[in-house]
């Protein structure tokens, strides 16, 4: 099995492409969904409240505001949550060894040094204008958090340069499907 990491900037189309691949029958893992599942655990919530005493109670929106405005709090949370995420990722890979390809969406793949867990990395990208258009349609959109995420993440250009493959998601569906089909063919040649 080839483990493929999918990354990209905020609102670049990562989840859309991951869902597309899932609908086509490929095994997929989403770091954001995994973390949301982890956050449902009461014991884990209590541990996070101990790590981040600034939080009066467990609330994902409050956590987002805190970690995007406090570098130390963000680092503490990442140091706690990343090992749990890695365990889930490794389990996903073990459970899917019989498949040719398995795709994992990891938004901060390079920033978190997760590239070591993948055979290949694909960066999803599009223009800043399209990313902003997509972002403002999200219920949880906050311009301050959006700007802070941009500061924290590597630039799209850096992610494209580091990646083995890249896909421009700022195109029509037909062109996007062509890019995904080409990616799959390129990857299947390497299995």
UniProtKB/Swiss-Prot annotation:
One of its GO terms (molecular function) is dephospho-CoA kinase activity. It is an enzyme of class 2 (transferase). This is Dephospho-CoA kinase. It holds the Pfam family CoaE. Its EC number is 2.7.1.24. It catalyses: 3'-dephospho-CoA + ATP = ADP + CoA + H(+). The gene is coaE. Residues 3-191 form the DPCK domain. It comes from Rickettsia prowazekii (strain Madrid E). GO terms for cellular component: cytoplasm. Belongs to the CoaE family.
